[in-house]
């Protein structure tokens, strides 16, 4: 290890590598003339190799798929890029360069960090396809280039007004560029020279540079033989200064882009120089929380830094590996750790399922003693010490009072790994020993203009470096093995201890803690080289007692002041192993072994996913609500029916939409189907006649009696008792045998016919009686019809009950019963019939009662559909007439018996008539 260190000391004689902005292959391809619409565009590009989500290569045509991906702005004045360009090497071996294969708007692309330790990005298109791209660059350049890509992703995800600089002059967006701007960085070896590369420097309106420094910058520009291509200086500012700039509205001028999310100032016109474009390349190369160097940052040739005797030679920005802090100088506040955590956490691919342990999370605050990850692993002999407050890596910008304790590592990630959960070295609550006086702001013997203690402790009372309350690792554990220079198989690295001249008890600077094996042993089975910070001459105590105090158990963890500052992480290209200039004695070597586990720990903020399940419950009910209403009014019947269908459904479905997320859906459906049916029925045909039932019945009897047709068969028609309950029921109490024929009976069911009855030719006499016995002697014959009286009211003939005294008397005024002729006319009196008639007369004589009969003839009621009796409005319900068919038997005696049976019913009908008449009359 000592031999390797001694060999590296000779390399600075050959030249110091410096970061130089150059044209990338994709930018060169656009300048060949084949893509004329794509004029010189502000672009940032890098070479990538397509891999799988686990890091394995993807083979296309039996070879790895290499490509160049760049982001560019379609207009030179745009602050943010808006298109993504992808080029691939030409398949023809004769053709050199790239072939542009893809040009996709950035609105349709989502770019994120997939794995920090493997330098892998994830490209997801709007169609859903995902591609994993690993950065393809030399080992000494990959860290810085990947850091630029991370900053680009951060800028694309946050609103631009938070970081866009303010300019005094603006130019049109489509102003063509004089030459193609640089699109990438390259670490180039320079000849031995103490001059640094001078590039254009941005002037903020609220910052003025001394006239002497401007003259020096112009002199350096004239003495240069080579000039950087394009605007290669990453201009630097801080978010705290943006607040000051916003307070000066007179100095603000912004240009609105037609796109709503990209409205910023883009181009500035210097007073005496050519057009300097605030390009995408310059924006990406800067960091979010850095500011422009102040006069204290870039000192003159007489100024010294940290008492090392190394001189920052140029006041202008230096783009070199030795001292890139010229444009990475900055200051941080108490808000910077939060901003750093928030910006870096948003870059991670939250949707990726194969995040490694190094990319699973980030510490909310940077560790107490963050080990730097420089981009170059080659230390230099007369190396310039990093100025105080130089920012190293994507961590929070350090305070200007913090020295740079630097460590080298080939491919250690620039972001600190949180998933390893290494216990950081916290600040103990004990007071410093008597020999260690807490310094205020003067740690160095040859004090520079800047006051810088080695590592400020909380409240300036604890010599150890304070650690955050979170489980932030004090040592980054990348997946790739870190090695010093080319000695990768070595398991441990040498860490130079401070020289013997430094008295430990009189140390006036707080100690920089070292990490013992116990602090990192539980996290790695593989032994990898891990480099600890090599502090300056007056920054590290040598006594074992001080080491034990610096590494004391955490007693004050979580009690961090608001103004607490931390050591920054380094950027690749910074030399780390420093040599003591006070003497040439060999430095003792301290060997530290670390272990890290291969266990991949998946840590997520979401809850643990539950086992997926699906439960579905369905319940459905159909209810029929039916309501029927029937109305009957004056022989009109109406029926209404209302039906309602009620459908009640309950659906409960529980299914996992996402891993660990259960969704419960409760759906209730209520459907009402109303079906309304209305049926109105008119009165029956029996009730639709304008005549009363009594009038129609008597009219039917009269028509039947006057009919000339003599049917062969006769039927007995018996009138119901309710028809006899009329004032004239005494006269119509006789039952007559009426022949029943379909043609004649249809009158009751068909259309009503107005029929007038022929009046009788005789007048009624009170209590006129006629014996029933005359019926047997009087032959049946046709009734003579007197002339009709059309104007007179129809009169219904009445018959009185016969008496025994007048059985053989024939009255002239007596009219025969209007019955149709029947075969009874041919019958002769027989002894059997006389006997039956005599019995009938005796029965009639016994039941005979005198009754006064009204002499007024019965008039037909008015023609209206309802039949009313007297003063009562009672509705008469229809009743069917009882039809009895009398068969014509062979013997005449049976017919006589049937006739006598019908006649025997008359006294009972008359008796019921007398009993019902008072009610009907009432």
Curated annotation (Swiss-Prot):
Compositionally biased residues, Basic and acidic residues: 758-788
Biased composition annotated in UniProt, kind: Low complexity: 442-458, 471-495
Compositional bias of kind Pro residues: 431-441, 496-507
Similarity field: Belongs to the GARIN family.
Stated name of the protein: Golgi-associated RAB2 interactor protein 5B
Biased composition (Polar residues): 292-305
Organism of this sequence: Homo sapiens (Human)
Region (Disordered): 244-264, 292-317, 373-404, 424-597, 758-830, 842-869
InterPro entries (UniProt xref): GARIL-like_Rab2B-bd
Top-level taxon of origin: Eukaryota
């Amino acid at each position: 290890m000592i031999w390797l260190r001694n060999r590296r000391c000779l390399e600075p004689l050959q030249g110091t590598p410096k970061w130089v902005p150059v044209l990338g292959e994709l930018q060169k391809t656009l300048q060949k003339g084949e893509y004329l619409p794509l004029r010189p565009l502000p672009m940032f590009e890098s070479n990538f190799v397509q891999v799988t989500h686990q890091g394995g290569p993807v083979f296309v045509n039996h070879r790895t798929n290499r490509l160049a991906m760049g982001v560019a702005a379609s207009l030179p004045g745009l602050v943010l890029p808006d298109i993504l360009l992808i080029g691939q090497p030409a398949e023809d071996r004769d053709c050199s360069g790239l072939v542009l294969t893809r040009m996709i708007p950035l609105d349709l692309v989502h770019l994120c960090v997939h794995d920090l330790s493997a330098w892998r990005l994830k490209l997801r298109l709007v169609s859903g396809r995902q591609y994993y791209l690993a950065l393809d660059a030399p080992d000494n350049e990959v860290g810085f280039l990947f850091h630029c890509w991370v900053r680009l992703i951060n800028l694309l995800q946050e609103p631009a007004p938070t970081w866009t600089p303010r300019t005094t002059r603006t130019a049109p967006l489509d102003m063509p560029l004089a030459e193609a701007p640089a699109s990438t960085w390259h670490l180039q070896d320079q000849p031995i020279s103490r001059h640094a590369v001078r590039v254009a420097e941005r002037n903020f309106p609220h910052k003025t540079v001394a006239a002497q420094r401007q003259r020096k910058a112009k002199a350096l520009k004239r003495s240069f033989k080579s000039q950087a291509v394009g605007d290669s200086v990453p201009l630097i500012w801080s978010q705290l200064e943006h607040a000051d700039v916003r307070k000066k509205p007179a100095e603000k001028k912004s240009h609105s882009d037609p796109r709503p999310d990209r409205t910023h100032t883009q181009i500035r016109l210097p007073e005496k120089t050519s057009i300097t474009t605030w390009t995408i390349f310059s924006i990406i190369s800067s960091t979010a929380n850095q500011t422009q160097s102040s006069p204290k940052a870039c000192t003159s040739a007489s100024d010294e830094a940290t008492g090392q005797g190394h001189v920052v030679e140029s006041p202008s920005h230096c783009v070199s590996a030795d001292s890139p802090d010229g444009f990475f100088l900055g200051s941080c506040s108490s808000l910077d750790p939060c901003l750093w955590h928030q910006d870096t956490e948003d870059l991670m691919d939250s949707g990726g399922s194969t995040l490694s342990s190094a990319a699973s999370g980030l510490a909310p605050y940077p560790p107490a003693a963050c080990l730097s990850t420089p981009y170059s692993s080659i230390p230099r002999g007369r190396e310039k010490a990093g100025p105080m407050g130089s920012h190293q890596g994507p961590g929070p910008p350090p305070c200007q009072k913090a020295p740079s304790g630097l460590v080298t590592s080939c491919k250690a990630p620039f972001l600190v790994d949180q998933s390893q959960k290494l216990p950081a070295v916290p600040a103990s609550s004990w007071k410093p020993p008597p020999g260690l006086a807490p310094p205020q702001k003067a740690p160095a013997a040859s004090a520079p203009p800047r006051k810088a203690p080695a590592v400020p402790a909380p409240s300036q009372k604890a010599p150890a470096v304070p650690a955050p309350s979170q489980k932030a690792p004090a040592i980054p554990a990348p997946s790739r093995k870190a090695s010093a220079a080319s000695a990768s198989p070595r398991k441990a690295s040498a860490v130079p201890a401070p020289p013997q001249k430094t008295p430990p008890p009189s140390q006036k600077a707080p100690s920089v803690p070292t990490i013992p094996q116990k602090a990192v042993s539980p996290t790695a089975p593989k032994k990898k080289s891990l480099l600890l910070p090599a502090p300056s001459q007056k920054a590290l105590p040598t006594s074992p007692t001080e080491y034990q105090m610096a590494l004391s158990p955490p007693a004050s963890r979580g009690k961090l002041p608001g103004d607490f500052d931390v050591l920054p992480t380094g950027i690749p290209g910074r030399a780390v192993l420093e040599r003591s200039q006070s003497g040439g004695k060999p430095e003792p070597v301290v060997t530290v072994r670390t272990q890290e586990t291969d266990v991949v720990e998946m840590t997520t903020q979401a809850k643990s996913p539950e086992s997926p399940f699906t439960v579905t419950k369905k319940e459905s009910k159909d209810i029929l609500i039916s309501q029927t209403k029937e109305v009957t009014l004056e022989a009109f019947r109406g029926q209404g029916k209302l039906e309602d269908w009620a459908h009640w459904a309950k659906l409960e479905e529980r299914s996992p939409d996402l891993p660990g997320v259960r969704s419960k859906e409760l759906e209730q459906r209520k459907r009402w189907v109303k079906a309304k049916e209305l049926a109105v029925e008119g009165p029956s045909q029996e009730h639709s006649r304008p005549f009363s039932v009594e009038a129609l019945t008597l009219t039917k009897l009269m028509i039947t009696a006057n009919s000339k047709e003599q049917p062969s068969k006769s039927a007995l028609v018996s009138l119901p008792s309710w028809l006899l309950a009329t004032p004239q029921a005494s006269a119509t109490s006789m039952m007559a045998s009426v022949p029943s024929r379909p043609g004649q009976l249809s009158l009751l069911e068909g259309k009503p016919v107005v029929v007038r009855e022929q009046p009788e030719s005789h007048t009624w006499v009170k209590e006129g009686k006629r014996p029933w016995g005359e019926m047997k002697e009087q032959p049946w014959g046709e009734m003579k019809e007197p002339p009709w009286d059309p104007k007179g009211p129809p009169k219904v003939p009445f018959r009185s009950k016969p008496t025994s005294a007048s059985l053989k008397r024939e009255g002239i005024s007596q009219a025969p019963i209007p019955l149709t002729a029947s075969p009874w006319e041919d019958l002769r009196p027989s002894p059997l019939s006389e006997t039956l008639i005599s019995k009938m007369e005796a029965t009639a004589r016994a039941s005979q009662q005198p009754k006064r009969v009204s002499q007024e003839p019965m008039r037909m009621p008015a023609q209206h559909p309802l039949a009313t009796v007297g003063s009562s409005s009672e509705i008469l319900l229809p009743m069917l007439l009882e039809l009895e068919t009398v068969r014509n038997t062979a013997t005449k005696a049976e017919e006589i018996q049937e006739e006598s049976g019908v006649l025997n019913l008359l006294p009972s009908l008359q008796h019921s008539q007398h009993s019902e008449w008072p009610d009907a009359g009432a």
